[in-house]
Amino acid sequence: MKINASVRKICEKCRLIRRRGRIIVICFNPKHKQRQG
């Protein structure tokens, strides 16, 4: 999981989700997992 100041979709399968006030990206590709920090 990468922690970035700005998160964005990398591919078509990435999904942006708000969880506990944080924006996270989940994807079938584990390299695309991101969280806003």
From Swiss-Prot:
Domain of life per record: Eukaryota
Cellular localization per UniProt: Plastid, Chloroplast
Name the record gives this protein: Large ribosomal subunit protein bL36c
InterPro entries with a match to the protein in the record: Ribosomal_bL36, Ribosomal_bL36_sp
PROSITE patterns to which the protein is assigned, alphabetical: RIBOSOMAL_L36
Plastid in keyword set: yes
HAMAP family: Ribosomal_bL36
GO biological process annotation, one example: translation
GO MF annotations in UniProt: structural constituent of ribosome
Family listed: Belongs to the bacterial ribosomal protein bL36 family.
SUPFAM superfamilies assigned to the protein according to its UniProt record, in alphabetical order: Ribosomal protein L36
This protein's UniProt keywords: Chloroplast, Plastid, Ribonucleoprotein, Ribosomal protein
One Pfam family, short name: Ribosomal_L36
GO cellular component, one term: chloroplast
Organism, as annotated: Phaseolus vulgaris
